[in-house]
Design a protein with these regions (language model features):
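Glycine-rich beta-alpha junction loops
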Residues: 64, 181-182, 238-242, 443-444
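Active-site nucleophile and cofactor-binding loops and adjacent substrate-binding regions
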Residues: 5, 20-32, 57-63, 88, ...
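Short coil/turn connectors at secondary-structure junctions
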Residues: 52-55, 63, 78-82, 101-103, ...
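Cofactor-binding active-site loop characterized by glycine-rich and histidine/acidic residues
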Residues: 30-168, 364, 371-374, 402
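Acidic/polar loop patches that form or flank catalytic/metal-binding clefts of enzymes
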Residues: 209, 276-280, 409-412, 436-439
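Conserved acidic/glycine
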Residues: 1-31, 35, 148-149, 153-157, ...
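Thiamine diphosphate
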Residues: 108-111, 116-229, 233, 427, ...
Length: 445
C-alpha cells in the first residue's frame, strides 16, 4: 500500500503542476515515498487543525507545495480535489507557496532556510510549554516537530544559526528530514557545495541517520527511531528528484517546470495507473489515508479527557496562555522623566511580562544594551528570557514559529542596523500578521 499511496501523491502533484502550467513537480515526486510513510507517524486531527498537542509538520521548501496539498487532501483536511485542480490560481486555497489561510498549513516558510528555523521555533515553544504545563500525571504537551528540507535550505546561513541553537538545547522533539537529491536549479550541487552534512550536524549536537529515501523499510525504521532520541534528529534521505518521471528523473529540468502531459501519461502507465485519468485517487488509498481523521479525533478526545486531572493552577495558566490579556498590564508613568527610549521600553516590556504569562523573548546577545531582559522571569527553557546568541536571522524566524505555536507572544531585539540580517523573517511575520514584536535600538532611533 505504501507504493500505491506514494504513486498517488506523485501523480496528484504532477497533475497539479501540469494543469497550472507552472510549479515544482520534482521535490513532491522525490519525497512521496517518505511522505507515504510519515503519514502513519504524524499525530494530528484533520477535523481540528488547531489542536494544541498535534505534531507540527513544516515544509521548509515551500516550492514543494503540491506535496503539501496532496498530503492535506489525502489526510482529510478541509481541502477538495477541486482545490487541487485550482493549484496556483488567483484566490485559490492552494497557492504556489503554502499560506496559513489553508487549513493544515502550520507556517508560511518563504525563502529557503526559513522553515528550518521555524521548526526549531516550534520545538523550542513545545519544550517551554511542556515545562510550564506538564506534571507527573498529565502530558499537556508531548508532540514532535517534523521538518522537510532540501539542499538549498542547508546551504542558507539561517540553517546553521538555527540548528546550532537546536543542538545546544538538545531539542529531542525535533526531526529534520533532509531531501538529499544533489540537484539545484543550475544543476548538480557539486557546482558550489561539497559539505559533509552528517559531520556538520553531529558537530552541532544532532543524532544523524542516513537512509535510502525510496526504501520503505529504511524510512519506517528511521522514523520509528525518532521517539528514542535524546537530541535533535536529522534523517539524511538520499533521494532522486522527480522519482518516477522516467527520463526527467534525477535531472534539474524536473525542478521547476511541468513535466509535460505525454511524459506524465507514460509515467502513470509505467506505475500501473490509468494514463488518461487526472487527479485520480482510488478508494482503497483514500480509506487508508483518511483513517487519520478518526484516529486524530480519538487522540484529541483522550487528550482533552486527560486535562481534567490538571490542578486548578495549571488550568488557569493554560487558559491565560491561550487567551493573553494585555488589558491587565500596569504600564509605568514616565511623566517628568527623561529616559532613553530603550530604557522606557525596557520598563514597559517588564510590566507586560509581569501581567501576561505568554509574553517572552530575547535579544541576539544584546539584551543589556537593548534593555530587554525580563527581570525575575528566568532563562529558557525554564523561563521567559531566550538567549539566541549572535543569530539575528534565526532569532526572528524562530520567534515567528513561537508566535504561530498558539500559546506565546514573543519579541525579537537587536540594534536597528542589524535588522538587515533578519528582514526576510520580519517580512514573513508581516505577511502572516503574527503577534511578534520587533525591538530595535540605537542607530539614530
Amino acid at each position: 500500500m505504501n507504493t500505491k499511496i506514494s504513486n498517488t501523491i506523485k501523480f496528484l502533484s504532477a497533475d497539479m503542476v501540469q494543469k497550472a502550467n507552472s510549479g515544482h513537480p520534482g521535490a513532491p515526486m522525490g519525497l512521496s515515498d517518505i511522505m507515504s510513510v510519515l503519514m502513519k507517524f504524524i499525530k494530528h486531527n484533520p477535523k481540528n487543525p488547531k489542536w494544541l498537542n498535534r505534531d507540527r509538520l513544516v515544509f521548509s521548501g515551500g516550492h514543494a507545495s503540491a506535496l503539501v496539498y496532496s498530503y492535506l487532501y489525502l489526510s482529510g483536511y478541509d481541502l477538495s480535489l477541486d482545490d487541487l485542480k485550482n493549484f496556483r490560481q488567483l484566490h485559490s486555497r492552494t497557492p504556489g507557496h503554502p499560506e496559513i489561510t489553508t487549513n493544515g498549513v502550520e507556517i508560511a516558510t518563504g525563502p529557503l532556510g526559513q522553515g528550518i528555523a521555524n521548526a526549531v521555533g516550534f520545538a523550542l515553544a513545545s519544550k517551554y510549554a511542556a515545562n510550564l504545563l506538564n506534571d507527573e500525571k498529565t502530558k499537556v504537551i508531548d508532540h514532535k516537530v517534523y521538518c522537510f528540507c532540501g539542499d538549498g535550505d542547508l546551504e542558507e546561513g539561517i540553517s546553521y544559526e538555527a540548528c546550532a541553537l537546536a543542538g545546544f538545547h538538545k531539542l529531542d522533539n525535533l526531526v529534520i528530514i533532509y531531501d538529499s537529491n544533489n540537484i539545484t536549479i543550475e544543476g548538480s550541487t557539486n557546482l558550489a557545495w561539497n559539505e559533509d552534512v552528517k559531520a556538520r550536524f553531529e558537530a552541532q549536537g544532532f543524532e544523524v541517520a542516513r537512509i535510502d529515501g525510496h526504501d520503505f523499510t529504511q524510512i519506517e525504521f528511521a522514523l520509528s527511531e525518532a521517539k528514542n532520541k535524546t537530541k535533535p534528529y536529522l534523517i539524511i534521505a538520499n533521494t532522486k528528484i522527480a522519482k518516477g518521471a522516467l527520463e526527467l528523473e534525477n535531472t534539474s529540468k524536473s525542478h521547476g517546470a511541468p513535466l509535460g502531459e505525454e511524459l506524465i501519461q507514460r509515467a502513470k502507465k509505467e506505475a500501473g495507473f490509468d494514463p488518461d485519468k487526472h487527479f485520480f485517487v482510488s478508494e482503497d488509498v483514500l480509506f487508508q489515508t483518511r483513517a487519520a481523521v478518526e484516529k486524530g479525533d480519538l487522540e484529541e478526545a483522550l487528550w482533552k479527557k486527560s486535562l481534567e486531572s490538571l490542578t486548578s493552577e495549571k488550568k488557569e495558566l493554560l487558559n491565560s496562555l491561550l487567551n493573553p490579556d494585555f488589558s491587565k498590564v500596569e504600564y509605568p508613568d514616565f511623566s517628568g522623566q527623561k529616559l532613553a527610549t530603550r530604557d522606557s521600553n525596557g520598563k514597559i516590556i517588564n510590566a507586560i511580562s509581569k501581567a501576561v504569562p505568554s509574553f517572552l523573548g530575547g535579544s541576539a546577545d544584546l539584551a543589556p544594551s537593548n534593555k530587554t531582559t525580563l527581570n525575575d522571569a528566568g532563562t529558557f527553557p525554564d523561563g521567559k528570557n531566550i538567549h539566541f546568541g549572535i543569530r539575528e536571522h534565526a532569532m526572528a524566524a524562530i520567534n515567528n514559529a513561537i508566535a504561530r505555536y498558539g500559546l506565546f507572544v514573543p519579541f525579537s531585539a537587536t540594534f536597528f542596523i542589524f535588522s538587515d540580517y533578519l528582514k526576510n523573517s520580519a517580512r514573513m511575520a508581516a505577511l502572516m500578521k503574527l503577534k511578534h514584536f520587533f525591538i530595535f535600538t540605537h542607530d539614530s532611533i
